[in-house]
Amino acid sequence: MYGQVERKRVNFGKITNLDYLPNLIQIQKRSFDWFLQADVKDETKRRHQGLEAVFRETFPIESPNNDMIMEYSHYILGEPKRSPQECKDTDATFAMPLKAVIRLIIKETGEIREQTVYMGDLPVMTEQGTFIINGAERVVVSQLHRSPGIFFSYDMERDVFSARVIPYRGSWLEFEMDNKGILIAKIDRKKKFPATLLVKSLGHGTNEEVLRLFYSSKKEKIAGATSKDLKKILGRRTINDIINMETGEVMLEAGSKINEDNISILKEMKVKEVELIEFPKGKDNPILINALEKDGVNDYEDAILKFHSLMRQGEPSTIENATTELTRLFFSPKTFDLGEVGRYKINSKFEFNNPKEFSGEKARVLRPADIIETVRYILNLFSETENYYPDDIDHLGNRRIRSVGELISNQLKTGFSRVERVIKERMTVQEIETQTPQLLISIKPITAVINEFFGSSQLSQFMDQTNPLAELTHKRRLNALGPGGLSRDRAGMEVRDVHYSHYGRMCPIETPEGPNIGLILSMSSYARVNDYGFLETPYRTVKNGKVTGQIEHLTADKEEYHYIAQASGVIDEKGELKNKLISTRHRGDFPFRNPSEIQYMDLAPLQVVSVSTALIPFLEHDDANRALMGSNMQRQAVPLLREEAPFVGTGMETRAAYDSRICIVNKHDGVVTSVDAENIVVERKGGKESDTYQLTKFKKTNQGTCFNQKPIVGVVHSEINGKVSKVSKEKIEVTGENGELKEYVLQIGSKQYSPIVSAGEEVKRGSTLAGQVVVGEKLDEMGNILVKGTVLADGPAVDNGVLALGRNVLAAFMPWEGYNFEDAILISERIVRDDVFSSIHIEEFEIQARETKLGPEQITRDIPNLSDKAFRDLDETGVIRIGAEVKPGDILVGMVTPKGETDLTPEYKLLHSIFGEKAKDVRDSSLRMPNGFEGTVIDIKRFSRENQDELPAGVEEMVKVFVARKRKLLVGDKMAGRHGNKGVVARVMAEEDMPYMEDGTPLDIVLNPLGVPSRMNLGQIFETQLGFAASKLGISFETPVFDGAEESDVDNFCKEANLPLNSKFKLYDGRTGLPFMNEVFCGYIYILKLAHLVEDKIHARSTGPYSLVTQQPLGGKAQFGGQRLGEMEVWALEAYGASHTLQELLTIKSDDMLGRARIYEAIVKGIHSIKPGIPESFNVLVQELRGLALDIIITDSEGNTVDISDYEDEYSKSKKKIKFETIENA
């Protein structure tokens, strides 16, 4: 606004540079652009990825009898029918129509029938990286799953290695050693067979061929060898069969061990030399030879037939069938797909040892070479050969990200495969002459999978919109659960734990507490996802000990081989690393290295942590557990009525608010020409075009908080009527009608204004003289920000473009009369009175008028049997007026529903026949304000078929009522700082009774000092002290994570502000005026109000619903339930011998149906009597025992058998009056 000066900001960061931060919601937007390729100008030249790949993999489709073929040309995207805001208002999906150009070619005639076929509506991502599905904003969370490829693992308990080939789609192949020392293969975790059978089926038929494939050999002389030489070959194995030339008999099979008997036989046969296997490291390793003995075949044909009979038991085995089966399992693109990632992982695994076969390979199916190389690798692992290591399954090189685009295309593949089946069926059924692509294609399976994925998939989530940070974090979340991921129950400690490869890729701090810990994670602030779906983090390159300006992004795999210096390494003016030995990171270790041995250096200290953790000042002084709570609780902060940026921040606040896209950002350079509460108009440079930005006012978010945008740019208005006398870059002068001169300065702080009027122009009071100069946003092709645009309007929880989740309040750390015992908080009445922590909450109530069998429901003011008071705020149509104050039970929308004739009693029917009173054939089904809600009606939206609004089937009219309510801070509300220091308001104290400082300033909030030492979150102490200096000096501080203010910096600013270095002050008791015994630590701390408001939780039941089976009251506020009296409470009452109280609680106050009816009557009639009956849960128990075939007999006190069911029925049938024994008050 004009005339408003911004607070000066002091940044303590020495190395943190936020300019290198990627666009924080890039992961969502890039992935969806990859999928849709909407920006490609020529639709026929889209890349083979995402949606295009789905079409290309489904088509062409040939008819079963080969007489026609259906081909795909390209797809066309239409325009969305409604804007995102309209979709939210009408509960519609923000989607664009998808059409595809399909050709049907009749083979016999060569005729081509081409049509543009509508393939359904595809939900589209909004500017903010969200989807609007049925009017609700949703986010598709990225999934962290095990990457396709080949993995070698080591089982410590059994001391064996195993290999696993995991494809993107298709059969799993595993190799491992069984208990008998045989190398076995498993397909799809089911069929086990010797691994050599698979190798032989690939064309290496004999034992000798298999051995030569994996081992080298050496010839050793036998004829003429000395006994010493012959001793050396004892225990070695032959690589080939040794055959008696005369008889043709195999004397020694390939792989046989040579012993003394064999040597004498060989001498007898006059064998001159034998070829022996050279095992790695000379250790005999028989696992392959054991498998060769077990497989029992010695040529290719036998091997492949045996393989087929194992895989397809009971089917006739022919060479052709067997080859087809093997191809189907691993070598056919239709049934087996490694994906680009799987192939990339296999290549990178084997390239080092076999570059000829594996560098630059592109095949997405397995090749025989892949299987053979896998077997070779596992044999080398068993032989402990150098450069052969098992993989770490939790390493981020073996886990990848599936983002939105990939998740949607996987779903569409399922839909399209169903479509393919339908097309083939229809091709055979319909006549060729009449067939067209439109008639053959059914889009139902496609729309079904899209709706199912967006509506009910575990990864498509209702967006957390509590505040901008919650929204941003939700889009950057990584989820290891979901289809194809882990399950909560089976995930062990190792998967959940922090791994060294997470550094700079996934935040080690931000994860939920509870069963999902370590399974739901957040991306680190600088991390990005590469084309293969692996997380990368940026590093500055170091060459010959000198830090270059180059930045390289490394995946976890690539980082393995390098030594990386930390960002805080000391660098001189030339960019060279100063110290002789530098602390580096290498895999999970921290060795010291010379500068010449270092290849990379961290970019910034905060690259380790996520955005919300990077918002915690002095994070380095907090314990990790509390930092985790602090990160999570910032996401629960409610946007307040008056936002205030923190006095002590980290510098990340501006970027978090900007990238959350909750503010309005200017798109083109220009000048603001007009500003009001709903629109901002910016005239572009050159003055030919102007852009109008519409502000969102008081809309409900998913969590019921208030979304409201406020302009922060301005124009200069004339304050007088007169004439512009002078215009320059610095100022505008206006001479008034009475000759007075008014000056308007055009540079205020960082804001520059540009004149819109010229000298000599007549101006009226309120005329626009100048507009603020604004910068347009510029992005690169990756979506990263090159130039930040000017923020035109703040969103919720944003103050002047800076994220502002809470308020700065004057706090003291001292115990006060026990009101802050155990994390409770004592606050001043001023905070409530001045609306410091007040927030606006909006609730939406909806009613639909439907067409019923008995006639339509009607929204009307004419409701039977109600007093005039109930209608006082309804308009003539029966809808409440905007501005009305509503309380529980008030009518929001009047509606009547036709009543069925069956409902009428005989007396009513008689009245009808006499008076013909048909008007009362309706019952009241109005929308009323539910219990526990009150507020002011701020908006009403009406939709009806008459106005051509789209409504669900059977709905004639729909009304939505929005009720807003200002919530002040109450006792019981949860509040928290940014360091995991949470508590509940215990008392709101009169301002004059609060402790006050020597100058008479009363405190706003009193916290318990005992909450600090055991929790080790000292960040709050530093923040409080620096906050006081900021308040006194009128500036704001930025102290970046791990690169912030040191103690000396804090001390220097305290001196400047004339504050004591220990920040301790003499305080006086507000009630007595006497000073407290000790000085107290005081300062300004940033406190948030969390979304756990006491009003939403407090609840009391009068009369409510009962469970159908047990007849006990339901539980929970939503069901208007009762308070559970559990077994421990029963024990407590038993311990006190309170038998009557206990009996009453277990029977008439709970599930004794007869007793409930009686007690009601007794209360109405004023009779002081209670006679408990049998609780319904006892009947349920009896029936359950009878269900177990146990005959249960119940007897009364006199030994007579009581039939419970009769006992009840008698009561309900006769409805006889119950006699009450009146107890006289003697």
UniProtKB/Swiss-Prot annotation:
GO molecular function list: DNA binding; DNA-directed RNA polymerase activity; ribonucleoside binding
This protein's record includes keyword Transferase: yes
EC number: 2.7.7.6
Record CDD domains: RNA_pol_B_RPB2
Cellular component aspect of the GO annotation: DNA-directed RNA polymerase complex
GO biological process, any: DNA-templated transcription
Gene3D superfamilies (alphabetical): 2.40.50.100, 2.40.50.150, 3.90.1100.10, DNA-directed RNA polymerase, beta subunit, external 1 domain (2.30.150.10), DNA-directed RNA polymerase, subunit 2, domain 6 (2.40.270.10), RNA polymerase alpha subunit dimerisation domain (3.90.1800.10), RNA polymerase Rpb2, domain 2 (3.90.1110.10)
Keywords: DNA-directed RNA polymerase, Nucleotidyltransferase, Transcription, Transferase
Keyword Phosphoprotein in annotation: no
NCBIfam families: rpoB (TIGR02013)
Quaternary structure annotation from Swiss-Prot or TrEMBL: The RNAP catalytic core consists of 2 alpha, 1 beta, 1 beta' and 1 omega subunit. When a sigma factor is associated with the core the holoenzyme is formed, which can initiate transcription.
Protein name from the UniProt record: DNA-directed RNA polymerase subunit beta
Organism (species): Leptospira interrogans serogroup Icterohaemorrhagiae serovar Lai (strain 56601)
